[in-house]
Design a protein with these regions (language model features):
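Aromatic-rich, lipid-facing transmembrane alpha helices and their immediate juxtamembrane interface loops
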Residues: 1-255
Length: 255
């Protein structure tokens, strides 16, 4: 049980550090506060899983810097690709996109990013982990296994809430796509008129769709996803670009 408690504490600490890194980096880049993370709480589990994978599979080779670097980069890249693929299949959405980064693979991973992760993992193993290990030992000595148990409960409830919330989001964007598809049929019947009139009619149809079907449908967590993930791409959704624009409009107007 003590070993499991150690793993849970390490997972939480590195998940928090990952969330802190992403939040600070993205906030500076966007010049505004950006609350990152798939879950509600201040942690990004992908970082926890990534660092734990490195610590338990690659750290034994820490004296061989090349193996440590390459092994870390490969492990984290595989995890990033699998996570991206899984989220897309589950929720019909892509949370990050590396298509504009050189040497990318399906926009899910990219060589420059992987090389950066490799450097980060070397820094963690050589410099950060020895200090984190001291913190974990202190926490275990102070709180026993209770802190780890609380972390599991809180993150578990957070995960359940987020999954339910994302299922609602998936249902909403699917409904949006289908509704816009229906409205397009009405729009096509007007193409024999002047283009500017048809365009104006299409804008009215979209506005009517927004007001009649989708106002007040986005909750706080869903607005956060749209606001803090500008590269969020909808997959396998009818009229995905129009749905994305509609989501932005609803979010900006607080509806």
């Amino acid at each position: 049980m003590e070993k499991m408690s150690q793993v849970i504490l390490l997972f939480f600490i590195y998940s928090f550090i990952g969330w802190l890194w992403e939040t600070v980096y993205c906030s500076l880049k966007a010049k505004k506060f950006v609350y990152r993370g798939f879950l509600v709480g201040p942690y990004c589990p992908i970082y926890g899983f990534g660092v734990l994978s490195v610590l338990y599979f690659v750290e034994p080779f820490e004296n061989n810097l090349l193996v440590l670097y390459v092994g870390s980069a490969v492990l984290v890249t595989i995890l990033e690709y699998v996570t991206s693929y899984g989220l897309e299949k589950l929720f019909h959405a892509s949370w990050w996109d590396y298509h504009d980064v050189p040497f990318n693979l399906n926009g899910r991973v990219a060589l420059p990013v992987s090389l950066f992760w490799g450097l980060g993992c070397v820094l963690i193993v050589k410099v950060i982990q020895p200090e984190i290990a001291k913190v974990v030992s202190f926490l275990q000595a102070t709180f026993g296994n209770y802190l780890a148990l609380c972390i599991v409960i809180v993150m578990g409830l957070d995960l359940i809430y987020t999954l339910l919330n994302m299922q609602g989001f998936k249902k909403l964007i699917t409904e949006m796509g289908q509704t816009l598809e229906t409205n397009q049929q009405e729009f096509k019947q007007r193409l024999n008129t002047k283009m500017e009139i048809a365009t104006a009619d299409w804008q009215k149809l979209k506005e009517r769709t927004k007001k009649e079907h989708f106002q007040n449908r986005l909750n706080f967590q869903q607005r956060r996803f749209i606001n803090n993930y500008p590269k969020l791409t909808l997959k396998n959704i009818k009229n995905s670009k129009e749905v994305r624009h509609l989501l932005e409009d609803l979010k900006n107007k607080g509806q």
